[in-house]
Amino acid sequence: MIPRISRNAVKEGFDTLPAAICYFDRNGLLRLINHRMQEIAAVLCGRDLQTLTDLEQALRSPGGGVRLRDEAARIYEFPDGTVYHFTVRPVQDKYGIPYTEVMAT
């Protein structure tokens, strides 16, 4: 018998990933975000992240002392000297429901 994993265990594992990651639904609403991405988004956007549009606008015109180092490669330097490469890609869950995944590594 395969043991069931609780939602809390999944979220805890998601929060401890070394990459910053979040998922938006087909309407662009934030559905899942880990702690690292929350921290990055707060600096980049100046507030809590709510929508994909908010993040896209912040990536086009970063705030909080964030510097765009390479627009084509989506590489940003944060005030603490940390450099992140952002990727955006469509994904689907096991039911075929589409989401947008954003990662910063």
Where do the model's predicted regions map?
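Terminal output helix/cap of sensory domains in signal transduction proteins
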Residues: 47-81, 85-87
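Sensory modules in modular signal-transduction proteins
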Residues: 2-32
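Flexible loop/coil segments at beta-strand boundaries within sensory signal-transduction domains
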Residues: 79, 91-97
